[in-house]
């Protein structure tokens, strides 16, 4: 689901990339929004909605939170757009937020999962990070069954309201 696009096909604000697998593989306990340090061509490529964060993860390096293994392909429109597509990218958070999340990761054995990359109303790129507890296989099956039941229930409610 992409955000609002301009005439040039670029996303002005809204969703640029989503990690649906992250919400399935982890029980998300808490979320926060963090800024991300990007170069110009990376932002343009991100605005085209070409990024992938399915295999991405966030971790601590030198007291800061970094996003690893996210894929932002090179922007084809420019000549000087040479950058590493899978380079680690620094996330911008307050010190207290960093301490809170790193403490939770070390205590509870949780993980920092990037859930999506989006552009806010001001056009700034943001990453939604979730503090996730890993799910076991039976938990995943339960989540699938619950989701299917909600879908079937909504379908039954819709169909029962029709007059034949």
Swiss-Prot record:
Q: Name one GO cellular component term.
A: cytosol
Keywords annotated in UniProt? Cytoplasm, RNA-binding
- Pfam families in the record: SmpB
Which cell locations does it reside in?
Cytoplasm
Membrane spanning segments where? none
Gene Ontology terms, MF aspect: RNA binding
A Gene Ontology annotation in the biological process aspect, one of them, is: trans-translation
Spell out the Gene3D superfamilies in the cross-references: 2.40.280.10
Q: Any signal peptide, and if so, which residues?
A: none
Which InterPro entries does this entry report, sorted A to Z?
Answer: SmpB, SsrA-bd_prot, SsrA-bd_prot_CS
**What is the documented function of this protein?**
Required for rescue of stalled ribosomes mediated by trans-translation. Binds to transfer-messenger RNA (tmRNA), required for stable association of tmRNA with ribosomes. tmRNA and SmpB together mimic tRNA shape, replacing the anticodon stem-loop with SmpB. tmRNA is encoded by the ssrA gene; the 2 termini fold to resemble tRNA(Ala) and it encodes a 'tag peptide', a short internal open reading frame. During trans-translation Ala-aminoacylated tmRNA acts like a tRNA, entering the A-site of stalled ribosomes, displacing the stalled mRNA.
Q: Which family does it belong to?
A: Belongs to the SmpB family.
Against PANTHER family, the record matches this protein to:
SSRA-BINDING PROTEIN (PTHR30308:SF2), TMRNA-BINDING COMPONENT OF TRANS-TRANSLATION TAGGING COMPLEX (PTHR30308)
Q: What is this protein called?
A: SsrA-binding protein
Which species is the source of this protein? Answer: Gluconobacter oxydans (strain 621H)
Query: What is the gene name?
Result: smpB
């Amino acid at each position: 689901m992409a955000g609002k696009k301009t005439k040039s096909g670029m996303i002005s604000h809204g969703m640029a990339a989503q990690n649906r697998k992250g919400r399935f593989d982890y029980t998300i306990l808490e979320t926060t929004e963090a800024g991300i340090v990007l170069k110009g061509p990376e932002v343009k490529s991100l605005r085209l909605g070409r990024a992938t964060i399915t295999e991405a993860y966030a971790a601590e390096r030198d007291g800061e939170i970094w996003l690893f293994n996210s894929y932002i392909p090179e922007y084809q429109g420019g000549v000087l757009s040479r950058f590493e597509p899978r380079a680690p990218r620094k996330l911008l958070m307050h010190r207290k937020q960093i301490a809170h999340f790193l403490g939770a990761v070390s205590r509870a054995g949780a993980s920092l999962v990037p859930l999506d990359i989006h552009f806010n109303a001001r056009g700034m790129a943001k990453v939604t990070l979730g503090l996730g507890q890993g799910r076991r296989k039976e938990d995943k099956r339960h989540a699938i069954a619950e989701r299917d039941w909600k879908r079937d229930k909504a379908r039954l409610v819709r169909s029962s309201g029709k007059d034949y």
